[in-house]
């Protein structure tokens, strides 16, 4: 693995292959009007490599370069259950839904070594170059992640929707999507890192839950001998605003940054399929 493929051919001499173990168990039910699937999963990633970065500042606190901390031996454990169903109680009504409940967390601590923007080993966060990669003066930190929730993805999601068929060729549907148990991704910065020391993370900021309604409609018809379908979609019908992901370093919303909000509804252009 190259340390900085854009500017250097230096490779990570301690890089190892990532390993994945996964197991699933599922059950399905089928009837004339109802289909249900239930699934349980367990996945473990081992020896992941992760990189976080920040600015190297001069004496006036102006950025002069970028540093990265290359962490090895990072494990993660994802487990949960998933349920989905499709019901058609009448020929003109279809109801569908899903529920996913997960428990995802980092499962190990990691040691990270520092490099500058050119992939050179750093002796400190002031930009001093170390004598060699993994030399005694090569700056490193231990990052304690074990038990910290994995961020940037909701661990509890649900959806419920209904589609109505009416007249001849018309179809309209409304779906609600719900997101919860979403955590901000952990962050490293120069003020919180101690070269040669330990950086301990607690549970990151838990992002408030959110959801939105989406509307869709279609009409099937013929143009001569050709079959055509006219589609239309309106996402986030009621202009709900909620946080999708964020980054923080201390587990509080006050210091969260990189926050991304769901936007006001987007109406997709009408499409004609022939």
Residue spans for each PLM region:
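Repeated loop/turn-to-beta-strand initiation elements of outer-membrane beta-barrel proteins
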Residues: 33-36, 92-95, 168-172, 223-228
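C-terminal beta-signal and adjacent terminal beta-strands/loops
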Residues: 177-191, 219-263, 267, 271
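Solvent-exposed loop segments that connect transmembrane elements
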Residues: 1-12, 50-70, 107-146, 184-203, ...
């Amino acid at each position: 693995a190259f340390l900085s493929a854009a500017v250097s051919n230096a490779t990570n001499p301690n890089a190892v292959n990532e390993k994945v173990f996964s197991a699933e168990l599922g059950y399905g039910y089928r009837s004339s009007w109802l289909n249900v699937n239930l699934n349980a999963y367990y996945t473990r990633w081992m020896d992941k490599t992760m990189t976080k970065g920040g600015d190297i500042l001069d004496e006036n606190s102006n950025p002069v370069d970028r540093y990265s901390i290359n962490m090895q031996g990072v494990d993660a454990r994802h487990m949960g259950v998933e349920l989905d169903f499709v019901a058609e109680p009448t020929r003109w009504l279809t109801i569908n839904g899903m529920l996913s409940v997960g428990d995802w967390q980092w499962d190990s601590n990691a040691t990270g070594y520092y490099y500058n923007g050119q992939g050179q080993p750093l002796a400190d966060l002031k930009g001093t170059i170390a004598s060699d990669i993994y030399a005694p003066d090569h700056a490193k930190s231990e990052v304690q992640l074990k038990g910290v929730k994995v961020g940037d993805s909701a661990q509890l999601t649900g959806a419920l929707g209904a589609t109505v068929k009416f007249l001849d060729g018309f179809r309209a549907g409304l779906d609600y999507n719900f997101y919860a148990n979403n955590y901000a991704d952990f962050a490293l910065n120069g003020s919180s890192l101690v070269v040669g020391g330990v950086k301990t993370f607690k549970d990151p900021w838990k992002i408030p839950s959110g959801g939105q309604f989406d509307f869709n409609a279609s009409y099937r018809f013929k143009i001569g001998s050709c079959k055509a379908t006219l589609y239309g979609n309106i996402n986030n019908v009621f202009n709900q605003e909620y946080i999708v992901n964020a980054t923080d370093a201390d587990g509080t919303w006050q210091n969260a940054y990189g926050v991304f909000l769901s936007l006001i509804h987007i109406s997709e252009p009408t499409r004609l399929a022939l």
